[in-house]
């Protein structure tokens, strides 16, 4: 039988079969690939991380085979979840399987399974419904403010949602602001492969440039994208390398690029420490403000009589925004008293200005014992995350063009000291 040399290597996989085999080419020693993978998962768990595997099952794959494969990786390797690809997968059977009941399942559509299986919250919707509204707002392509709001506050009572602006099926986050068009010529398909609808913007020059004002704007938009993802409800997801601005030179379908195009350039990480530090600080802010990851959907009212609605929206006037998605700016106020963690109950106000001009938004008060502190400012090129937050006066907040600012409502130091003295005195 003749053998045929393939012109290129699809190193992503996505082929039928081999559902019980470790990919030996990822191992240091191919003969010990299974042992190495188990050691990797143990090490991840020791550091508080999880391992989620991605599987592609073509339509028509035997249901029993799918369930057996998933159980195998959970029982033999202790993986923590699966991102499943393929049409008409048996999601009800997967959701009801007791051996997978503590395993995170990511899929595009759970159908009836998402409503029926309320006994455990391990089902997550993973699709691009967040990606496109976010890109449209950032780069001004048929944007819709109402659609953006829906995505930022989206949270299910049963299903979880994964939010991303970039993933492996498209531009990296940095390339989203460097290229108007895909550049997949190296894939050998006449640049016809990959997503043609990217809603990207190069801001004046296609690809890298030495023009400082363009590079500053691109970095600001990168910071805005990070903030949008991290300030949204649901599960934030970043494509590996996006945390420090990794580029694939405009290739948005690097399935066959087992080379510097498809690799992450870790050397460039050292020259982009400011971006990585910004992401780390924003991630920490999200962890310290659990109201940004509320386990239940918001009601948009003060149903517990805590002093303010759980989530409210603000435009030029407090408690009001422009109707019908006609604007490019709004403020979202999260009431910290509705946080599930009593130790972290600061209010959070996220002010968005996606327009190319300065905008003023209303800034509601936070009571007599609290003040607003500016914590994050995407327009600040040097210190976008403030180590020493600035006090902001109530009434309104001015936003430069293409800017997101995040404020925290905290107790004023004098009141905090009085409370601590009262506790010590038993008052």
Predicted regions and their residues:
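Aromatic- and acidic-residue-enriched carbohydrate-binding clefts of CAZyme catalytic domains
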Residues: 2-46, 59-76, 186-207, 258-263
């Amino acid at each position: 039988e003749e053998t045929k040399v393939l012109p290129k290597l699809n190193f992503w996989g996505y082929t039928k079969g081999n559902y019980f085999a470790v990919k030996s080419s990822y191992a240091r020693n191919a003969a010990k690939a299974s042992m190495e993978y188990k050691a990797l998962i143990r090490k991840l768990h020791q550091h508080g991380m999880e391992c989620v595997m991605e599987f592609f099952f073509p339509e028509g794959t035997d249901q029993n085979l799918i369930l057996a494969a998933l159980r195998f990786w959970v029982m033999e390797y202790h993986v923590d979840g699966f991102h499943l690809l393929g049409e008409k997968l048996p999601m009800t059977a997967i959701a009801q399987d007791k051996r997978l009941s503590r395993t995170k399942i990511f899929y595009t559509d759970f159908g009836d399974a998402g409503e029926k299986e309320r006994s455990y919250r391990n089902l997550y919707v993973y699709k691009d419904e967040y990606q496109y509204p976010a890109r449209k707002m950032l780069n001004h392509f048929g944007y819709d403010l109402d659609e953006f709001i829906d995505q930022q506050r989206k949270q299910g009572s049963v299903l979880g949602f994964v939010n991303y602006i970039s993933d492996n099926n498209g531009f990296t986050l940095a390339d989203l602001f460097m290229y108007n068009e895909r550049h997949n010529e190296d894939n050998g398909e006449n640049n016809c492969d990959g997503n043609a609808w990217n809603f990207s913007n190069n801001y004046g020059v296609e690809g890298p440039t030495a023009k400082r004002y363009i590079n500053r704007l691109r970095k600001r938009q990168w910071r805005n994208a990070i903030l949008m993802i991290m300030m949204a409800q649901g599960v934030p997801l970043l494509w590996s390398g996006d945390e420090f601005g990794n580029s694939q030179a405009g290739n948005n379908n690097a399935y066959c690029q087992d080379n510097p195009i498809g690799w992450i350039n870790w050397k460039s990480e050292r020259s982009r420490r400011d971006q990585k530090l910004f992401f780390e600080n924003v991630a920490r802010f999200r962890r310290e403000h659990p109201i940004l990851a509320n386990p239940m959907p918001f009601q948009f009212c003060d149903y517990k009589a805590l002093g303010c609605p759980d989530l409210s929206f603000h435009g030029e006037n407090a408690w009001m925004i422009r109707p019908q998605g006609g604007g490019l700016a709004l403020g979202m106020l999260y009431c910290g008293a509705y946080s599930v963690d009593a130790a972290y109950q600061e209010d959070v106000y996220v002010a968005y200005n996606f327009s190319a001009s300065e905008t003023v938004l209303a800034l509601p008060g936070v009571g007599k014992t609290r003040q607003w502190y500016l914590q994050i400012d995407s327009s600040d090129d040097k210190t976008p995350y403030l180590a020493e937050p600035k006090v902001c006066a109530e009434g309104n907040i001015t936003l430069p063009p293409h800017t997101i600012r995040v404020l925290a409502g905290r107790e004023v130091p004098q009141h905090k000291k009085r409370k601590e003295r009262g506790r010590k005195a038993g008052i």
